[in-house]
Amino acid sequence: MWRSWLREAHQSFERLPYESKQDRVVEDISKAIMSIKEAIFGEDEQSSSKEHAQGIASEACRVGLVSDLVTYLTVLDFETRKDVVQIFCAIIRITLEDGGRPGRDYVLAHPDVLSTLFYGYEDPEIALNCGQMFRECIRHEDIAKFVLECNLFEELFEKLNVQSFEVASDAFATFKDLLTRHKQLVAAFLQENYEDFFSQLDKLLTSDNYVTRRQSLKLLGELLLDRVNVKIMMQYVSDVNNLILMMNLLKDSSRSIQFEAFHVFKVFVANPNKTKPVADILVNNKNKLLTYLEDFHNDRDDEQFKEEKAVIIKEISMMHA
């Protein structure tokens, strides 16, 4: 039965551009999509059939329905779009009995699927749907590697600064997933593309948008403190310009940004092999830093933070020219 639903959906999608009255075709598509969803996930309390789900994933990729789902997302109604997201994500996740992953392989063979999803961020109507499907794709390391190495990653920086809070936040969720899920892959990528990546990140850290500054600063701290990125961390904290940026963010009007900046600033101070420019800045600003840190977030009920702050204050107080 599910084969006929797949065939009906695919044929309807193919007819759609040539129909003068699309409403009826869209209605047929919506019904077929609902039936496909029920075949994958089960209806009501009934459990779904694993065999059906695997069959649907394979067939949807074979006939090109996966591309249809993302290409024509804009013409579907709100509820059908949600069904499409569920179906698409299931297809991308499904592993066959022989270990095959038809959804992953389809996307790798048809990278236009990724481009369509990515540029969906430009349409507020479907932006969040596209973001969710894009993130499902990059759960696969092969796809994440492709995205990091193509123009989409560079363009993603632009999506983080769009006017819409919802779209910018979703784009940042994608950005974070891409940089934290596959740690070894990302560590190698950051080492190879250090200058380009951090020059782009600096723009986010100095953005006029508060949310952009805070989220990018928090992500920076997470990246630097991850053991797999130790080489990146050492390179970052050796640059005096990065220290100056963090010292400025320590004094940001937002307490949240101050707090996130502290977690990066402490890495500069704790580094036993400081470069001379970094050490000079810390020594030259020693008294100001100590005065500022003594009263820094004293009302925060966080024992680990209090201990770390005490260590940083002690380390700075022991520094001398």
Curated annotation (Swiss-Prot):
One of its GO terms (biological process) is intracellular signal transduction. Signal peptide: none annotated. One of its GO terms (molecular function) is protein serine/threonine kinase activator activity. InterPro entries: ARM-like, ARM-type_fold, Mo25. Coiled coil: none annotated. Gene3D superfamilies: Leucine-rich Repeat Variant. Belongs to the Mo25 family. PANTHER family: CALCIUM-BINDING PROTEIN 39-RELATED, PROTEIN MO25. This is Degreening-related gene dee76 protein.
